[in-house]
Amino acid sequence: MQSIPVKNAGDRLVDAYRRTYYYLRLSITDVCNFRCNYCLPDGYHPSHERDKFLTVDEIRRAVSAFAAMGAQKVRITGGEPTLRKDFLQITENITALDGIRHVALTTNGYRMAQDVGAWKQAGISSINVSVDSLDPRMFYQITGENKFTEVMRGIDRAFEAGYRKIKVNSVLMKDLNEREFDKFLAWVKDRPIQMRFIELMQTGEMDAFFRCHHLSGQVLAEKLIRDGWQLQSKGITDGPAKVFRHPDYVGEIGLIMPYEPDFCASCNRLRVSAKGKLHLCLFGEEGIDLRDLLQRDDQQSLLQARLFAALQGKREHHFLHRGDSGIRKNLSTIGG
């Protein structure tokens, strides 16, 4: 995978606040087979829209345009992306594109034990897997699925397949998994796992749940610093997590705290939904339709022009601190 030189600012993914975007989060499906209480507590229900999910060729054209404008990292998300039967073909196409140096996957892990070797062979560079509790009963209470053993086996298989580090995501929730912080610390002490705690975020369908269970990640940050954990610097394609390391631990701790005052200042990522809409912010507008420019290979220059023009309208920051989550009903539609 080669790096493509970007000639001038007009060719690059740069917004009006001079933030440069190297990272694309690409949802390839809204469908998920888990029923997490902070996202889809009633399970997935197909929408009545006629639009189908992006095809393999549409995905290739979309990522190609982002790569030509300087994007280096793609994260494949959902829903649960591995539910697509053409998931491996999608992955292989993305990894073959010039300029794309890193292809990551976010998964609930239910297929990980059986398929992780094929994922690695297809070109998945790194994996984030959701584990909201290390207690099988609490895992079931949060996810609605009795898959704890299978997911944990999948993490072990990922290391056997050659992944040197796995990122594990856990949504931090008061009165549910908040008491497991020390258990998670012990779990990563001798394992090369980056354990990432994500602050519960307010969405349109989950206001009551948010009010009941939100807990600030700052509480954990202060505890980590008191206990000798050190904050690490970020790379240009890193996500929003603040990463901490400790000399006595093999693993790392990451904190994603969207309610911090400066959370948006280092934003480096854009999102494309499974139906081909560009979303400039996780908690933003309805989305800019790209699909009409994903039909032929000779539309790349028009697609890049639309991307650049749209990016100039990206807001300086979200308004979560005001209780404004935009039009986002839940996170399954855009992959978080």
Curated annotation (Swiss-Prot):
Keyword Nucleotide-binding on entry: yes
> Which PROSITE patterns does the annotation name?
MOAA_NIFB_PQQE, RADICAL_SAM
On whether Heme is a keyword of this UniProt record, the answer is no
- Its Enzyme Commission number(s) read 4.1.99.22
Question: Which processes are annotated in GO (biological process)?
Answer: Mo-molybdopterin cofactor biosynthetic process
Reaction(s) catalysed by this chain's protein: GTP + AH2 + S-adenosyl-L-methionine = (8S)-3',8-cyclo-7,8-dihydroguanosine 5'-triphosphate + 5'-deoxyadenosine + L-methionine + A + H(+)
Q: List the GO molecular function terms.
A: 4 iron, 4 sulfur cluster binding; cyclic pyranopterin monophosphate synthase activity; GTP 3',8'-cyclase activity; GTP binding; metal ion binding; S-adenosyl-L-methionine binding
Which positions are annotated as binding [4Fe-4S] cluster 2?
C264, C267, C281
InterPro entries per record: Aldolase_TIM (IPR013785), Elp3/MiaA/NifB-like_rSAM (IPR006638), MoaA (IPR013483), MoaA_NifB_PqqE_Fe-S-bd_CS (IPR000385), MoaA_twitch (IPR010505), MoCo_biosynth_MoaA/MoaC (IPR050105), rSAM (IPR007197)
In the UniProt record, the signal sequence range is none
> What does the record's cofactor remark say about binding?
Binds 2 [4Fe-4S] clusters. Binds 1 [4Fe-4S] cluster coordinated with 3 cysteines and an exchangeable S-adenosyl-L-methionine and 1 [4Fe-4S] cluster coordinated with 3 cysteines and the GTP-derived substrate.
Name the coenzymes or cofactors required. [4Fe-4S] cluster
Q: What HAMAP family does this protein's entry cite?
A: MoaA_B
- PANTHER family membership: GTP 3',8-CYCLASE, MOLYBDOPTERIN COFACTOR SYNTHESIS PROTEIN A
Family in the record:
Belongs to the radical SAM superfamily. MoaA family.
Write out the function statement from the record.
Answer: Catalyzes the cyclization of GTP to (8S)-3',8-cyclo-7,8-dihydroguanosine 5'-triphosphate.
Record-given protein name = GTP 3',8-cyclase
Instruction: Supply the gene name.
Output: moaA
